[in-house]
Amino acid sequence: MSEPLGLFGGTFDPVHFGHLRLAEESIAHLGLGGVRWIPAGQPPHRGVPQVTAQQRLEMVRLAMANNARFSLDPSEVEAEAPSYTVHTLERLRRELGPLQSLVLLVGADAFAGLATWHRWRDIFALAHVAVSHRPGFPVEISSLPHELASEFTDRRRADVRGLKASPAGGIVTFAMTQLAISATQIRKLLANELSARYLLPDSVLDYIQTHSLYRNS
């Protein structure tokens, strides 16, 4: 069986170093062969992004340009329908076959809300789920909704090598370097014409400035 493939979805509005570190560290912690970035087109769980889906896609393309282990999947941006994770996973499973191990990368906050996602239980039949958390702050079962806590207990794998042994169905957790960076923070800085340098790649910041993105209208 080939190495597990990480799947990293999000609005990336804009992509920043926190996103890049999560993707980079997941490869080392989880033994992934690479990470496929999947920018959302019309995210159903968030408000409408401030910039177009194509612009967010291009910013991710710029951010990951020099990392051979990163790849870009534009399918959700190109689709006209809202971006539901389970639909994307079904497409990838058809594309990559039943034996490829797929690992959905999510942060602890997003995982806590997993039970609100469309057909969330079906996700485990299609992929593993890897939950990143702050060092010293592991995922607490008591903080999860009952249904999700039950799934977490039943599916949790202590050894990440299990990700390669099966194509889907497990939950693993891993600590990642905590960077106090958020897309909301960056948008506020840019809207107020303050510097966002060193919070995101220079190539992305140059693109934002060239196209006058995130400015107050």
From Swiss-Prot:
One Pfam family matching this protein: CTP_transf_like
Example of a GO biological process term: NAD biosynthetic process
The entry's keywords: ATP-binding, NAD, Nucleotide-binding, Nucleotidyltransferase, Pyridine nucleotide biosynthesis, Transferase
Record SUPFAM superfamilies: Nucleotidylyl transferase
Pathway annotation: Cofactor biosynthesis; NAD(+) biosynthesis; deamido-NAD(+) from nicotinate D-ribonucleotide: step 1/1
Residue runs in coiled coils: none
GO molecular function (one): nicotinate-nucleotide adenylyltransferase activity
Taxonomy, superkingdom: Bacteria
EC number: 2.7.7.18
Catalytic activity, as annotated: nicotinate beta-D-ribonucleotide + ATP + H(+) = deamido-NAD(+) + diphosphate
InterPro entries: Cyt_trans-like (IPR004821), NadD/NMNAT (IPR005248), Rossmann-like_a/b/a_fold (IPR014729)
PANTHER family in UniProt: NICOTINATE-NUCLEOTIDE ADENYLYLTRANSFERASE-RELATED, PHOSPHOPANTETHEINE ADENYLYLTRANSFERASE
Function: Catalyzes the reversible adenylation of nicotinate mononucleotide (NaMN) to nicotinic acid adenine dinucleotide (NaAD).
HAMAP family per the UniProt record, alphabetical: NaMN_adenylyltr
Family that this chain belongs to: Belongs to the NadD family.
Protein name: Probable nicotinate-nucleotide adenylyltransferase
